[in-house]
Each structure stands twice: as structure tokens, then as C-alpha cells.
């Protein structure tokens, strides 16, 4: 038996399980990790040892190990944490595992120590498992051991470091703002925190550091950033969580081009450190150009299927739905061409009406141009030969195409077809190569909230109107544009920002247009208005959704896959049981009782 040496009591490990290669053959190593798999081949026992960096195969041979090492190997079970000492040796071509970065070597183990035992895990700790997400979230501490999840957390850490360094190198100052602040609702509900010392009064967890970073600009910070935790009590979707992280940025004594150029430098630097090239200067697309062409204010421009305006073609149509829209001010007739979907069965096409309804449609008009040259459609009988000819030409119709229509108010029609465009791209498995970056700029300043019967801010109530539209705000608020810019990545809103109102009178006018009385405005935002009176400089900023960007960089389906401890779609933490009841004594401490 080869000579063994005691494990160095001053070092838990000398190498990680992901770094050993052929050039390390002959090296003595100490490794720690979890038993991933164990295989008993009679006289030899093989074990895959896993840590956060990877997996290394261990070999236990009674002729090359002390007696305890082989005995321990016989008893080891999955997820036991162990510590071993051994010598790196080559596996040989016949037994090389090309799926592992360490697949050319193994460690001939001469000493082993069990650091703890484990009960049987509820699922296999490996990638590609068929386990429900609820189970994974309930045992999140086990799910995080999987290589895929650990790689996601590593990428998140690396990207956060990269953007911090990019900002620091450009003289941005990292400043922390309070997590307990005043309730100033910004579109979603606040999470509120009762004060024990001041009964009946409440703090709120910030939906964003928006007002505080503006105050930092008034205070002279000039270039600020923060990796900020934000809280919003809203309905959840695949890309939403009640608490999320954004890289928050603000600058003063700047105009919109200054801010966007600085952001492009920072983002290109950070993405470049991750091996992702972001070309600069970024394309800039006007909001209405994005809506009219892609049906989305966050378009994925890696594929076509553009929205096409057919309003003029159907102005005199016998199909009343189209004719009415074509002759009504503010309404349109538009379509998209899903090439290849024209071969779908009628039943499959009919189901698309249900999809369209989720985007606000009352139905879906369509024409399927079959491969054999025939046409299948419930509406084509109403079209004249001239209308069909014009439609074919403008939509670039070929056999196998499926043309889908929307008719009605411009924005709603754009949104319906934009939703269908995205759905069809997924259904047809249209390839989207690489990453897609652009700015969408100049959003409307307001939209009409039908439920409240009032104007609402499109972004937030502190956004500066475009200079040319300031005069028209009171006469025609919906026609006013804003100094805004959204950073779009792969068809997702990855970040957003804008220039801020830095004049107290203009800010009060904006709040009044949004339905605030002077008293309410003073109650909620008096501290901001007061600060703006003390020579507030021109300012603008941005917030990058860290969770969402990491989701896109890892190719994950949900931001939950790039967060250590996310909530479910209902806002629950299945691991801890939060939210949970609190004791009567705790409620009494803050002068509350349950109704």
C-alpha cells in the first residue's frame, strides 16, 4: 500500500472539485464537498465529489488507502459532506468523462473523513431533474447545490461586481438609502411597517429609491449608484417578485444625451466583462415607432413579423369591422404574417382567438394561405379582388402564410398584434441568435386610467416632459411626450429611466394633473417640493433590473432561477412559511389587532 499522510489539520482543502486537470497528475490534494454519486464495483469504490466549482471523481482502492478510508467509502451516501486526501492520476482515454471539466483525471484517495451525514434528499441533486418547482423552493438550500443553480448565482455575483466596478471607475459614488421610508405609492401598493415608538404611524419599504436619489442630486452628489432592494405589493408574473434588486443610478447637471451616453459606456463595460458584446452607440427607437412596427414598447428585433398598416386598403370594404375601423379617427386595420403557420389545421388556428383575447382582442380575423394555393378563412368572402391583391402585395404573402388582423383603436390593435407576434415566434420556434439591445425613447407622459377615470403617469410623476410638449400638457395631456428611455434586452424591459422635473412649480402642476390636491401633494411629497426650491440642478437617472438581466444572461425562464430565495407566484416563501401569523403580543407592541 502506498504511503499516506494525515490530512493537514490547518487546511480544509487545497483544491476545489472543479479545477483539477491533466497537468495536475501526481499532485497531492485535499478536497471537501458533498457525495454526489457512489458506485461500488466490488474491489473498487468510485465517488463523485461535488462542491460549488464542479465535480471530481474519487477512487477508493483498499490497496492504496488506509483501512478507514475504504471503510468510510463503503458507508457513504448521497449528500454526505466529506473531506479527503489523495493523489491526482489520469483516467486514461477509455474511462475519460467528456461531460466533466475534470473528466480526464481522478483522485486516488488514501484518507477520508465524514464531516456530517444526511437524510435522503427529496430529489436528486443534479441538473435536468423532473421535480416540481414547489418542491425545489421548499428545499431551496438543496436546489442551490445543483450545478446549474450555482452557476446562475456565480454569474449574478460576477455581473454585479462588473457593473459596480464600471460605475466606480466613472466616478459614480455608491450611497445607501433607507429601507424604512415614507409611504409614497408609485403605481403599486406599498409594503407598510408599523412603528412601535409612534403608535398609529407607519414606515413603507421603498418601491424604489426614486425620491431619495433625487434628493441626493439636490445635495450635490452628482453621480450616484446603489444596488438597491425594492419592494412592491403587486400581482406576480414570471418576471416579477415582491422584492427585487435594481442597479439604481442618477446624475445631475446633465441632459438626456449625457445620461444615455454614460449609461451606454457603463453597460457595454459590464456586459463586456461577461463576454457579451453590446454595440455602442445603441439604436434608439421612438415609442410609437416601436408600437407601430412591433406592437410592443420592448420589442425583440431579432426577428421580423412586423405589423403592417392596411387601413387604406379597407376604407371601402364590405367587411364592416374593417371598414368601420378604417374610417374612424384614431383607429386602424393592421396585420402580421406568420410564415409557415398557414399549414396549421383549422382547429389549431381557431385556438389562436383565445390567445388573442389575453391581449385584449374580442376575436381574431385570419387568412390561411395553404401550400396547395387554396385559401382558408372565415372573412375572405367579404374581400374584393382589389383588396385581396393589395393585401397579398403589402403582406408579402406566399403559400404557407397565416395573416392575422386587428382592427380598432391604434394602441389596442398594436398591443394585440404585438402579443400575437411574440406568441407565434415561440410557436414557430423562430431562432433568436445572440442578444438584442436598444433604447426605446420618448414615451407618452400620460395615459388614461379607465378604472379611475383620470390621467396616470406613464412612467412616474416626476418625469420631465419633452421641451416641445410642455406648452400642450394642460390642453391635451395625452399628446405630450416625456424625456424617457427604456433599455430593452431580448424583448424585455431590462431597465428604464428619464429626466426629472427639477422645478417645484412644474412638479406641483404635474401632480395636480394627476388628480392630487395641493394638500395631498404636500402631505406625500412636500419634502421633495421643498428641496426643489433650493436650486435643484437638472437631473436624470436610470434603474437596471438586475434579476431580469441575469435571467437573460443565463437563458433562464424566470427570475426565480437567478435569485437565491425567491417567492412563489402567490408571494409565499415555501421554505420558511412566510408570510406567517405573528403573536398577539407582537401586534400589541405596535398597537395593532386583527379584525
What are these regions (language model features)?
Residues 1-595:
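Class II aminoacyl-tRNA synthetase catalytic cores and aaRS-like
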Amino acid at each position: 500500500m502506498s504511503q499516506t499522510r494525515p490530512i493537514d489539520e490547518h487546511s480544509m482543502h487545497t483544491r476545489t472539485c472543479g479545477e483539477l486537470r491533466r497537468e495536475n497528475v501526481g499532485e497531492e490534494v485535499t478536497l471537501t464537498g458533498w457525495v454526489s454519486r457512489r458506485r461500488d464495483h466490488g474491489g473498487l469504490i468510485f465517488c463523485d465529489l461535488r462542491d460549488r466549482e464542479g465535480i471530481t471523481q474519487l477512487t477508493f482502492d483498499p490497496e492504496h488507502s488506509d483501512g478507514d478510508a475504504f471503510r468510510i467509502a463503503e458507508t457513504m451516501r448521497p449528500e454526505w459532506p466529506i473531506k479527503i486526501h489523495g493523489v491526482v492520476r489520469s483516467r486514461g482515454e477509455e474511462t475519460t468523462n467528456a461531460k466533466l471539466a475534470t473528466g480526464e483525471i481522478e483522485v486516488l484517495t488514501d484518507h477520508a473523513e465524514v464531516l456530517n451525514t444526511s437524510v435522503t434528499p427529496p430529489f436528486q441533486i443534479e441538473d435536468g431533474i423532473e421535480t416540481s418547482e414547489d418542491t425545489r423552493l421548499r428545499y431551496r438550500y438543496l436546489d442551490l447545490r445543483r450545478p446549474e443553480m450555482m452557476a446562475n448565482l456565480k454569474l449574478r455575483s460576477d455581473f454585479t461586481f462588473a457593473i459596480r466596478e464600471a460605475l466606480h471607475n466613472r466616478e459614480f459614488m455608491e450611497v445607501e438609502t433607507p429601507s424604512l421610508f415614507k409611504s409614497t405609492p408609485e403605481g403599486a401598493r406599498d409594503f407598510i411597517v408599523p412603528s412601535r415608538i409612534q403608535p398609529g404611524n407607519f414606515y413603507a419599504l421603498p418601491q424604489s429609491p426614486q425620491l431619495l436619489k433625487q434628493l441626493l442630486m439636490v445635495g450635490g452628489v452628482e453621480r450616484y449608484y446603489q444596488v438597491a432592494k425594492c419592494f412592491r405589493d403587486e400581482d406576480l408574473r414570471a418576471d416579477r417578485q415582491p422584492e427585487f434588486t435594481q442597479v439604481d443610478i442618477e446624475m445631475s447637471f446633465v441632459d438626456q444625451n449625457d445620461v444615455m451616453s454614460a449609461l451606454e459606456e457603463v453597460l457595454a463595460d459590464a456586459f463586456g466583462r461577461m463576454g457579451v458584446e453590446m454595440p455602442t452607440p445603441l439604436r434608439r427607437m421612438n415609442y410609437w415607432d416601436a408600437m407601430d412596427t412591433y406592437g410592443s414598447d420592448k420589442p425583440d428585433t431579432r426577428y421580423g413579423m412586423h405589423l403592417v398598416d392596411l387601413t387604406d386598403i379597407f376604407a371601402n370594404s364590405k367587411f364592416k369591422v374593417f371598414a368601420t375601423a378604417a374610417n374612424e379617427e384614431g383607429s386602424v386595420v393592421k396585420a402580421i404574417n406568420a410564415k409557415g403557420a398557414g399549414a396549421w389545421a383549422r382547429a389549431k388556428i381557431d385556438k389562436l382567438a383565445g390567445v388573442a383575447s389575453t391581449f385584449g382582442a374580442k376575436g381574431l380575423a385570419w387568412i390561411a394561405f395553404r401550400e396547395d394555393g387554396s385559401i382558408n378563412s372565415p372573412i375572405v368572402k367579404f374581400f374584393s379582388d382589389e383588396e385581396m391583391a393589395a393585401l397579398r402585395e403589402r403582406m408579402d404573402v406566399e403559400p404557407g402564410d397565416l395573416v392575422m388582423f386587428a382592427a380598432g383603436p391604434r394602441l389596442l390593435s398594436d398591443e394585440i398584434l404585438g402579443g400575437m407576434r411574440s406568441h407565434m415566434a415561440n410557436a414557430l420556434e423562430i431562432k433568436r441568435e445572440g442578444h438584442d439591445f436598444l433604447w426605446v425613447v420618448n414615451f407618452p407622459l400620460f395615459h388614461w386610467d379607465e378604472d379611475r377615470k383620470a390621467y396616470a403617469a406613464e412612467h412616474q410623476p416626476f418625469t420631465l416632459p419633452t421641451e416641445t410638449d410642455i406648452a400642450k400638457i394642460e390642453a391635451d395631456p395625452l399628446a405630450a411626450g416625456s424625456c424617457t428611455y427604456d433599455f430593452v434586452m431580448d424583448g424585455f424591459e431590462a431597465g428604464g429611466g428619464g429626466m426629472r422635473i427639477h422645478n417645484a412649480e412644474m412638479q406641483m402642476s404635474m401632480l395636480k394633473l394627476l388628480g392630487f390636491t395641493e394638500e395631498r401633494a404636500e402631505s406625500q411629497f412636500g419634502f421633495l417640493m421643498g428641496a426643489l426650491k433650493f436650486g435643484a440642478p437638472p437631473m436624470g437617472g436610470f434603474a437596471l433590473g438586475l434579476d431580469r438581466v441575469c435571467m437573460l444572461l443565463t437563458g433562464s425562464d424566470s427570475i426565480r432561477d437567478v435569485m437565491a430565495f425567491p417567492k412563489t407566484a402567490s408571494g409565499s416563501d415555501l421554505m420558511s412559511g412566510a408570510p406567517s401569523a405573528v403573536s398577539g403580543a407582537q401586534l400589541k407592541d405596535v398597537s395593532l389587532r386583527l379584525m
